[in-house]
Amino acid sequence: MQTRHSSCTTILVGKKASIDGSVMAGRNDDTFLPLTPQRYVVYPAYHNHPNQVKSYLNHFVGDRPADGYRYQGVPNVDLKKEGVYDENGFNEKNVAMSATESVYANERVLAFDPLNTESGINEDVIVALTLPFIDSARHGVEYLGQQVAKYGSAEGNGVIFADRDEVWYMEIVTGHHWVAQRIPDDCYALTGNRVAIQEVDFGDPDNFMWSAGIQDFVAQHHLNPDPDGWNFRRIFGTADVFDQHYNTPRQWYGHKLFNPELKFDPMDLDLPFVMKCDHLISLEEVQAYLGSHYQNTPYDPLGHGSEEDKRRFRPISLNRTQNSHVLQIKPDLPEAAQTIMWMALGGAPTFTPYLPLFGNADQADARLRNTPAEL
């Protein structure tokens, strides 16, 4: 399996937590190499044409239904070398998908359900396998869950689905097991490369979904360290010094922006995934978070802290951010005009403007879809 190291940051905002009633899903798509040229494309709808999607990174081949909706993607230019990686977009039903936030399970759980690295679902094809065939955010979780059961997963992936009413975060952490949580309407959620979902309520299928047999899997292999709870992060995730320097500080800084009165520690391994904000969140604040680098703290690499502090934590915005996007759904507008994909392409979102792209467009501008292989 060819690997593409990815390290992203995600922010999700429910419709009652936003200043204008929008649902917002934002993510920085980061890699370890700046800069991989990307294109913005619109794939047409198709009918009566069963087909397959194939990964360039492993031996995955997935069947696609005979009919598919029009959808957007932001693929790499050099598909054979870099993989497809459509990453983010809307389909014609105004359903948003952003994939993926790389997540990492611990060795205990992977020993009993290893990743299918040879032929499982990779990030590079996960959008093409899913987005053309879903009618809602909830349906997205259900549909992708069926594909994971069928093919297995090649890697740990956090996947975002959103529509005008809901935003869901799905974490696929082992070869076949996953959990998804609906973000409450009056809350926001933050994560960065760690298993994020915490307590799972198996009696609340309206707000949680999960892979078949996951409770039995955990019980059979004695994986739950908590006698009185079922914390997905504690069971399946990691909690080490790497997390404390690379992952948790990004979550900490977001909570500092949206709840400044709360005093968290940037190295706290139990930071909350979902919280209520002390005010209604604007689009500009979501974009500012994705472009942030610990401003007004000793940890700002462009600030005035000590050299040790400035290098202590991995910032949110990077020079190796391939694209930064906010998928916004505005339910107060006519259905055909409700979706906007705000895109910052080709560099650190700290210094790159966000371009609004119409989520229901039936074609992409030639200047964006014909990116050259060398910039």
Predicted features, each with a name:
Residues 43-44, 54-84, 287, 291, ...:
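Active-site gating/interface segments in enzymes
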Residues 133-139:
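Short, charged, surface-exposed loops that flank catalytic or proteolytic processing sites
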Residues 241-297, 320, 327:
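Long, repeat-rich segments with strong aromatic
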Residues 2-123, 143-264:
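A contiguous strand-loop segment
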Residues 299-375:
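Substrate-recognition/cap regions that form aromatic- and gly/pro-loop-enriched pockets
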Residues 127-133:
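Short, well-ordered beta-strand elements within core beta-sheets of diverse protein domains
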Residues 1-16, 293-315:
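Short, Gly/Pro- and small/polar-rich lid/capping loops
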Residues 140-149, 286-290:
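Short, well-structured alpha-helical segments that form the helix of a local strand-helix-strand
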